[in-house]
């Protein structure tokens, strides 16, 4: 998948509104052609060169922690987040595990597409951790596990 927001050339769209809702992000799914434009190649390279480590985007009870001290399902979620694209490709999200409850936030981030970045990261975490439930909107959004 590819999540496109701030790098999108909005003038190329046939329409950017639907039923009164303004389009804010585009998600493309599929395989890229063998030869891709230089701009896309640069974005792809930036994602591959991200150097964040799991400990940089995880906390336990609000304090820094290491993967070895976290449950396996949590680490699977974190690893998926580290591999996923985001709208601005900076991965500014932090996942916390406090008393068995996961929350996600983007401390000190103020950009136009931060809610998209947070949602993309939440989705990848949820899918990889294999938890069933729903995320609260906003920050910090807690994950409510389904019974």
What are these regions (language model features)?
Residues 1-147:
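Acidic, surface-exposed loops and disordered segments
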């Amino acid at each position: 998948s590819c999540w496109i927001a701030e790098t999108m050339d909005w003038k190329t769209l046939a329409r950017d509104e639907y039923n009164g809702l303004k389009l804010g992000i585009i998600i493309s799914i599929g395989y890229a052609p063998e030869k891709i434009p230089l701009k896309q190649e640069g974005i792809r390279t930036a994602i591959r060169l991200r150097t964040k480590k799991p400990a940089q985007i995880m906390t336990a009870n609000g304090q820094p922690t290491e993967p070895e001290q976290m449950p396996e399902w949590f680490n699977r979620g974190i690893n998926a987040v580290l591999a996923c694209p985001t709208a601005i490709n900076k991965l500014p999200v932090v996942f916390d595990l406090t008393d068995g409850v996961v929350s996600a936030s983007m401390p000190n981030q103020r950009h136009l597409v931060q809610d998209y970045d947070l949602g993309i990261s939440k989705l990848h975490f949820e899918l990889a951790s294999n938890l069933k439930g729903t995320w609260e909107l906003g920050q910090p959004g807690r994950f409510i596990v389904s019974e």
